[in-house]
Amino acid sequence: MCGIVGIVSRAPVNQLIYDGLLLLQHRGQDAAGIVTQQGRKFYMHKAKGMVRDVFRTRNMRALPGNVGLGQVRYPTAGNAFSEDEAQPFYVNAPFGLVLSHNGNLTNAAELKAELFNTDHRHINTDSDSEVLLNVLAHELEKTTRGLPLTPGDVFAAVRGVHRRVKGSYAVVALIAGHGLLAFRDPFGIRPLCIGHGQNEGTATVMVASESVALEGTGHQFDRDIAPGEAVYVDLEGQVHAEQCAAKAQLMPCIFEFVYLARPDSVLDGISVYQARLNLGETLAKRVVSTVPPSEIDVIIPIPESSRPSATQLAHLLGIPYREGFVKNRYVGRTFIMPGQGVRKKSVRQKLNVIASEFKGRNVLLVDDSIVRGTTSREIVQMARDAGARKVYLASAAPPVRFPNVYGIDMPTPGELVAHGRTVEEIRQEIGCDALIYQDVEGMKRAIRSLNPALDGFDASCFDGVYVTGDVTAETIAMMNSSRADTAEKIGEDSDVDVSRLALPNPQEA
């Protein structure tokens, strides 16, 4: 999962890109990068770290130009610890191209071999974004008929990308001296939208992963870029758009609405906040069928993205809603912890209980989802230590039983607490008195009701159905092997959690 921004203006764009990345910081906290273009020259700065840490005044001054793009990185392919794999990526031909990408290519290894053996292009990192950039460069080189570059040439190149590339990809790219290109995979798995505004009194076109990045920088949201569609904005600010996929279906990742996106964003016509309220409503029916409401004294959310679901659940059941956990926002990230003992300590550093809300009560804790189960187990124990008589746990999402291959770096199947276990076995593993999950079809109905025009969802981590149709057991095995290689490269012990999905919720940004 990453966050991307691209801007075409007649005034300097470095500050706008920076501001947009801050608004998307929840989508990536490992690295950040910005590229601007002045004339035919690119100016780039990228490094590991959060946006505020990577870009100082001197770095911003070194990013001139009226066109640019940026990315915050949360790696799902390649080496999360390599600064070389921070985006954007650059190639010098044709024209000069810079690209940032949100998603994950499921045929990256095949493409890498094809690029070397057939297209005679060299890939210098393990990043699938560099692979995608070189595929785009090769296709653009094939379609170009000489200067000036036409929108038709650009769209023909994107059609070539769609034919070759599998997986999820929302892309923003710069073509030196010509303009900005944005496109989305044929299933629209990862979000991308476009809007317009003013920058120092001049017209601006902006694309971004989420609508909140447009609104927070003073831009008007125009629309979502359609699955398979490409949008080309020339240096004059003229917007050209064309459908470039032979067959496109709108099937966004449902986990965006469950956890990943900010609640104040609207993705593919669906308010993320309203989606989470709806999940709370459907969850209420599941709770009633498992635990009589009379046996629940209080409903407490596990911060932060579960709050809308928890408030709706409490409202419908007529049970008091209370804040029982306080999050320490100044503790470092807990994404990678060597060993269970350190992970437990990190949870208690990140969250602290308000004991008076637990003492002598039967509490229902509400979380957005349960992935590994380690954090849930520790939180349940914290509630017991605070004096709770009984601790029930409800998940606004169904059991996460399958790995995600489309840009969410979840644990391998064996590390997922729900993989191969019944709900009762999961309950015993976590240690709660009752465990209530959302059901898959209920989740889909709750969110799809907000935009019936959707063709469906990628809900692969819940139902094991991979919408691109190319994911096999071998694909999963290769992913597991890659994760093991990553753990070996960083020299950690066998208990290292190389997944990036963990306690810090998106709403911290």
Each predicted region: which residue ranges?
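Extended, hydrophobic alpha-helical segments in both membrane/secreted and soluble proteins
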Residues: 299-302, 306-313, 317, 321, ...
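A conserved beta-strand->alpha-helix junction
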Residues: 130-135, 321-332, 429-447
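Amphipathic alpha-helical
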Residues: 135-152, 303, 311-333
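PRPP-dependent phosphoribosyltransferase catalytic core
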Residues: 162, 177-179, 184, 203, ...
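Phosphate/diphosphate-binding loops
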Residues: 160, 212-213, 217-221, 228-229, ...
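Short, glycine/charge-rich flexible loops or terminal/linker lids adjacent to PRPP-binding catalytic cores
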Residues: 316-363, 374, 401-411
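Conserved short alpha-helical segments that host acidic/polar catalytic motifs at enzyme active sites
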Residues: 1-227, 232-297, 302, 390
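Flexible glycine/proline-rich, aromatic-decorated loop/lid segments
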Residues: 203-210, 249-250, 334-348, 393, ...
